[in-house]
């Protein structure tokens, strides 16, 4: 069966949550038995996000095949549980590079290379490739940036051409825009969104669905006005109100009738739930559609029973997960000591993995972000971590804040504070233990001190220390866990696959010293033998992992390491109360 394509654009302002909406739509379709794949097209000229400043771009999400991609791919995976690849994240820079390389190789036969058709053709080819390589029934493509930005024009033109070829039954446009509320007049204003749609219409793209991003529920008058002036059917004016959690968004959109509407417009009924077609939720069903009894969503007309018919989605487990998130029975505080803590998106997958672990234990995780540069001694660390029930040090690069992290780990080790070190966090644990337990006072990493006499952390074989992209150990690798280790027990198996993004690791020359100590290597790469897991045998819960477990965590399937960390934190809290 020929694939269908959904394109999501954004208007008025950036950072409205197109990626969350795209992931939520993927979940709504997948819950109806429809195979989906999400992808992101960014208009910036960087080759990929790998070398971009975390303060500007947020985290780099690593795919199974080693792609350094936009953080929205993390949203896609957490919502749909469909693994992404490097090809699901495309930048304008990678598009232009491919075209210029092809031109230099004579691929265009001497023709004049232009934005149209060459750039737009390359974009279209990459959009279609997602369907060809995955076999997905629906390809959901998010176009980054904001409509009206000059750099987005080739992408908008490319999707216009795709619609011209495929028609409305195989191609659907969703435009997400802000509908602000002005307290001064007590009204929601539609004019910014109207002008955004006008800009899109000027580029030849007529939205089929408008997602109204708002802080308040939109009124019927707002729906009517947008329907009239944006030339969009009233039932396709969909509220996208701010939720307590991003994981409620799919349920809110389903209550608005969006899932059934998409199935109807793209004629997906025959592929839904084995061909069983059921009527969409009727009037008054919005509350149960979202959370069931005790839910938070209004039932006074926010649902549109005229949205047509579509297969009933199976969102039972998702609703249960959101209920567990909203109604915790316990709480704990997890401290995160890092380099980029002023921007939460820099550690987005870590925070979402902790949230998922909290859901698993019906516990609310209060995340306390601590700037590593503000810790100058072990005493400082003690004050900063006094109320923490667990500590996480996530990944990072560069020397800034390293000594503060070492002090934090020293406090955690001595005070029996549950600790999880991720990537750089494992290296910090190794350095701290070498200095204070193995008595190698000048121990360090060659990344931060090239001339250290005790480089307990060093470059891995085959890696090159360069700031340029493509020089890291990237992607999914197999790790073998030692018999009798705690790591093996909490995973429940001896072989695990985890994603990596690093070039440094435990120096093999010092491995024997650690094996004879309390901080033992218990997980190694199955091919090269590099140490990937260390655990402290004399500590209640102390692990360092060279990989990034946060990338494999899901809101309804917490990663074993985070799940066990939260359990240890809760146990510590109980013991102190």
UniProtKB/Swiss-Prot annotation:
Catalyzes the ATP-dependent amination of UTP to CTP with either L-glutamine or ammonia as the source of nitrogen. Regulates intracellular CTP levels through interactions with the four ribonucleotide triphosphates. This is CTP synthase. The lineage of its organism: Bacteria, Pseudomonadati, Spirochaetota, Spirochaetia, Spirochaetales. InterPro entries: Class_I_gatase-like (IPR029062), CTP_synthase (IPR004468), CTP_synthase_N (IPR017456), GATASE (IPR017926), GATase1_CTP_Synthase (IPR033828), P-loop_NTPase (IPR027417). UTP binds at residues 14, 189-194, 225. ATP binds at residues 15-20, 72. It comes from Treponema pallidum subsp. pallidum (strain SS14). Pathway: Pyrimidine metabolism; CTP biosynthesis via de novo pathway; CTP from UDP: step 2/2. Its EC number is 6.3.4.2. GO terms for biological process: 'de novo' CTP biosynthetic process; pyrimidine nucleobase biosynthetic process. Residues 1-268 are annotated as: Amidoligase domain. Gene3D superfamilies: 3.40.50.880, P-loop containing nucleotide triphosphate hydrolases. Mg(2+) binds at residues 72, 142. Belongs to the CTP synthase family. PROSITE patterns: GATASE_TYPE_1 (PS51273). CTP binds at residues 14, 149-151, 189-194, 225. GO terms for molecular function: ATP binding; CTP synthase activity; glutaminase activity; identical protein binding; metal ion binding. It catalyses: UTP + L-glutamine + ATP + H2O = CTP + L-glutamate + ADP + phosphate + 2 H(+); L-glutamine + H2O = L-glutamate + NH4(+); UTP + NH4(+) + ATP = CTP + ADP + phosphate + 2 H(+). It is an enzyme of class 6 (ligase).
